[in-house]
């Protein structure tokens, strides 16, 4: 049966990538269908009940700046908020929020259920309609064909998913859900490179069986921060509660090492590579054998939930071993496990087979986003879903495209890393992956991206107005401060000197004075003659950062300008690299396989030398591809 409602975009999968994808194309105005195997699991947090963290928080802020739903949802559902690295510079500060799982899912559903241009249908997808190497729709398990101009696959860990607990394995996309084996087989029949990855989750513990009195208490920040640029004054956080910290010990490690042969990871049952930066407890004990203990964050799953998430204890050991090592940990001596931990192995597709828009190079109008591309984490998935669906929507009746770059966002860093380098292990975002960290801060994500969001129609009118007002206030106040002078031996100077190490000897602007480490905006406000009445903390923060880091920011902007021309030099998709004399066989093979879209992208492919890029540039200039 063909169910033709004239859809522009079909999104397959209702996880974090799928939700952002479906919401984005619908906001742009594309008629969108979200296909999910179970409507009740839309927006479900399959693993840890948290959003954000180092690098990840930056992605959430950028998704929010583009009108996405993740930040607003966690503001509605967060039960503990913290700014990580708060004592360090603004480039590496990151927001992290503990979530109430049920409230988060409720918030996500509230946001997408009220989204115009979006339909939701429950059925798993078994096949794609592909004609002349172009996707035209999807076929469900019950035999319904949905036709559309674009298809975005956001299928998470469901492709050929296999769950492992010790030496017991069973098919599953996650605990309690069937895998998408038919769709996995269909995708394997297409000309994509495919491999296996592994991730895992810890056992869940009944909080009533835990002794919190012997653990360290970890409170959230006060005042409680917001994740979304648009939430303050509109969304009220739920009640805030603490998390706790405990540690493994020598007994824990002995139990684990004595039973390594029973672990699915170490017995050879699992072929896929696990996440380097979120290893199982077995991996930690083996790889860091010199460590006497490992930190465990004991995280509540919700305000009214009795389940705890022991972050740091992901495992594929048998259930009885899980019980033993859990009860060896301080505070967990009488712990009751409500759900066993497990590892899950699944198919992923080499992201080097994608364009920067996340459209596949081999099948036109088909986009991949999320764990199918080898990433790990809700935030990385959401970011990809956003970009994939933006491009699906804006290219329906034209050849338009938009994708972020390494110079304007962490989303750009994420996508560029994936499509140029690929990945052999689940990819996680860190601030260290970005060259321009001082410019790509959490606090200015809206200033970097919301102009484009307005242009694409991704922001609501209310959010657009909020952004424009904030941006104008920053511009106007910085201009005013650059044009307001204080001379020495004036009353203003005398009032100011109580904050300075030494007396003023020359005339300075307020902006230059703000560059001094001992001066901040609040001190300038104490000089009544200046009439500085600004009360918006977000605007003040941008003014202070612009002043105090002006030299570094200017330097990074110059670096970006130097590389911008190079980045924008497009390489035709049908470019014949064999015509370029002097390229080695290795370089020729890599360029031909990956088909980079720009010279900048080509330069970041592992094994492509500066000399090869020079030869390519010279040839492209000589033949008229570059002017």
From Swiss-Prot:
<keyword id="KW-0274">FAD</keyword>
<dbReference type="Pfam" id="PF01134">
    <property type="entry name" value="GIDA"/>
</dbReference>
<dbReference type="GO" id="GO:0050660">
    <property type="term" value="F:flavin adenine dinucleotide binding"/>
</dbReference>
<dbReference type="Pfam" id="PF13932">
    <property type="entry name" value="SAM_GIDA_C"/>
</dbReference>
<dbReference type="GO" id="GO:0002098">
    <property type="term" value="P:tRNA wobble uridine modification"/>
</dbReference>
<keyword id="KW-0520">NAD</keyword>
<dbReference type="InterPro" id="IPR049312">
    <property type="entry name" value="GIDA_C_N"/>
</dbReference>
<feature type="binding site">
    <location>
        <position position="125"/>
    </location>
    <ligand>
        <name>FAD</name>
    </ligand>
</feature>
<feature type="binding site">
    <location>
        <begin position="13"/>
        <end position="18"/>
    </location>
    <ligand>
        <name>FAD</name>
    </ligand>
</feature>
<keyword id="KW-0285">Flavoprotein</keyword>
<keyword id="KW-0963">Cytoplasm</keyword>
<dbReference type="InterPro" id="IPR044920">
    <property type="entry name" value="MnmG_C_subdom_sf"/>
</dbReference>
<dbReference type="InterPro" id="IPR002218">
    <property type="entry name" value="MnmG-rel"/>
</dbReference>
<dbReference type="InterPro" id="IPR004416">
    <property type="entry name" value="MnmG"/>
</dbReference>
<dbReference type="GO" id="GO:0030488">
    <property type="term" value="P:tRNA methylation"/>
</dbReference>
<dbReference type="InterPro" id="IPR020595">
    <property type="entry name" value="MnmG-rel_CS"/>
</dbReference>
<feature type="binding site">
    <location>
        <position position="180"/>
    </location>
    <ligand>
        <name>FAD</name>
    </ligand>
</feature>
<dbReference type="InterPro" id="IPR026904">
    <property type="entry name" value="MnmG_C"/>
</dbReference>
<keyword id="KW-0819">tRNA processing</keyword>
<dbReference type="InterPro" id="IPR047001">
    <property type="entry name" value="MnmG_C_subdom"/>
</dbReference>
<dbReference type="Pfam" id="PF21680">
    <property type="entry name" value="GIDA_C_1st"/>
</dbReference>
<dbReference type="InterPro" id="IPR036188">
    <property type="entry name" value="FAD/NAD-bd_sf"/>
</dbReference>
<comment type="function">
    <text>NAD-binding protein involved in the addition of a carboxymethylaminomethyl (cmnm) group at the wobble position (U34) of certain tRNAs, forming tRNA-cmnm(5)s(2)U34.</text>
</comment>
<feature type="binding site">
    <location>
        <begin position="274"/>
        <end position="288"/>
    </location>
    <ligand>
        <name>NAD(+)</name>
    </ligand>
</feature>
<dbReference type="GO" id="GO:0005829">
    <property type="term" value="C:cytosol"/>
</dbReference>
<dbReference type="InterPro" id="IPR040131">
    <property type="entry name" value="MnmG_N"/>
</dbReference>
<protein>
    <recommendedName>
        <fullName>tRNA uridine 5-carboxymethylaminomethyl modification enzyme MnmG</fullName>
    </recommendedName>
</protein>
<comment type="similarity">
    <text>Belongs to the MnmG family.</text>
</comment>
<feature type="binding site">
    <location>
        <position position="371"/>
    </location>
    <ligand>
        <name>FAD</name>
    </ligand>
</feature>
<comment type="subunit">
    <text>Homodimer. Heterotetramer of two MnmE and two MnmG subunits.</text>
</comment>
């Amino acid at each position: 049966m063909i169910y033709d409602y004239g859809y522009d975009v079909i999104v397959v999968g209702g996880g974090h990538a799928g939700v952002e994808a479906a919401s984005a194309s619908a906001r742009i105005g594309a008629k969108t269908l979200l296909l999910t195997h179970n409507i009740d699991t839309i927006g479900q947090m399959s693993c840890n009940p948290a959003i954000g963290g180092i690098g990840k928080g930056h992605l959430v802020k950028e998704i929010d700046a583009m009108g996405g739903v993740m930040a607003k949802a966690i503001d509605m559902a967060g039960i503990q908020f913290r700014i990580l690295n708060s004592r360090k510079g603004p480039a590496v500060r990151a927001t992290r929020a503990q979530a109430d799982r049920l409230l988060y899912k409720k918030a996500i559903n509230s946001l997408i259920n009220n989204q115009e241009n979006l339909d939701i249908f429950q059925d798993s997808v078994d096949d794609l309609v592909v004609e002349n190497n172009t996707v035209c729709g999807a076929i469900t398990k019950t035999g319904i064909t949905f036709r559309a101009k674009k298809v975005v696959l956001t299928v998470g860990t469901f492709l050929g998913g296999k769950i492992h607990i010790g030496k017991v394995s069973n098919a599953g996309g996650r605990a309690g859900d069937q895998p998408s084996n038919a769709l996995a087989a269909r995708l394997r029949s297409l000309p994509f490179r495919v491999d296996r990855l592994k991730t895992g989750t810890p056992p869940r513990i009944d909080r009533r069986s835990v002794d919190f009195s012997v653990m360290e208490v970890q409170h959230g920040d006060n005042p409680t921060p917001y994740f979304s640029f648009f939430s303050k004054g509109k969304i009220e956080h739920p009640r805030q509660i603490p998390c706790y910290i405990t540690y493994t010990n020598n007994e824990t490690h002995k139990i684990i090492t004595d039973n390594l042969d029973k672990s699915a990871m170490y017995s050879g049952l699992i072929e896929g590579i696990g996440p380097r930066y979120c290893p199982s407890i077995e991996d930690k004990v083996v790889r860091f054998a010199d460590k006497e203990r490992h930190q465990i964050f004991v995280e509540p799953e919700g305000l009214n939930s009795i389940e705890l998430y022991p972050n740091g204890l992901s495992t594929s050991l048998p259930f009885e071993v899980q019980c033993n090592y859990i009860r060896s940990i301080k505070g967990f001596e009488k712990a009751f496990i409500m759900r066993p931990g497990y590892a899950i192995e699944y198919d992923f597709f080499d992201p080097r087979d994608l364009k920067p828009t996340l459209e596949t190079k081999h099948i036109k109008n088909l986009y991949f986003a999320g764990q199918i591309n080898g990433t790990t984490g809700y935030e990385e998935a959401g970011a990809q879903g956003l970009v994939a669906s933006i491009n699906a929507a804006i290219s329906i009746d034209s050849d338009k495209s938009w994708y972020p770059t390494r110079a304007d966002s962490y989303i750009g860093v994420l996508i560029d890393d994936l499509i140029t380098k690929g990945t052999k292990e689940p990819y996680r975002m860190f601030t260290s992956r970005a060259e321009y960290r001082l410019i790509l801060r959490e606090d200015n994500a809206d200033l970097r991206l919301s102009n484009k969001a307005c242009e694409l129609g991704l922001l609501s009118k209310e959010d657009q107005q909020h952004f424009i007002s904030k941006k104008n206030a920053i511009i106007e106040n910085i201009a005013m401060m650059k044009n307001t002078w204080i001379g020495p031996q004036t009353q203003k100077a005398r009032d100011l000197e109580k904050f300075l190490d030494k007396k003023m000897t020359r005339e300075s602007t307020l902006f230059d004075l703000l560059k001094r480490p001992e001066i901040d905006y609040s001190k300038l406000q104490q000089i009544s003659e200046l009439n500085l009445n600004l009360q918006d903390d977000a605007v003040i923060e941008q003014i202070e950062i612009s002043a105090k880091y002006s030299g570094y920011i200017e330097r990074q902007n110059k670096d970006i300008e130097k590389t911008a021309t190079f980045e924008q030099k497009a390489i035709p998709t049908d470019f014949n690299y064999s015509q370029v004399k002097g390229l080695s066989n290795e370089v020729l093979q890599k360029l031909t396989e990956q088909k980079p879209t720009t010279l900048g992208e080509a330069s970041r492919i592992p094994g492509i030398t500066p000399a090869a890029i020079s030869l390519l540039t010279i040839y492209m200039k000589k033949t008229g591809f570059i002017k």
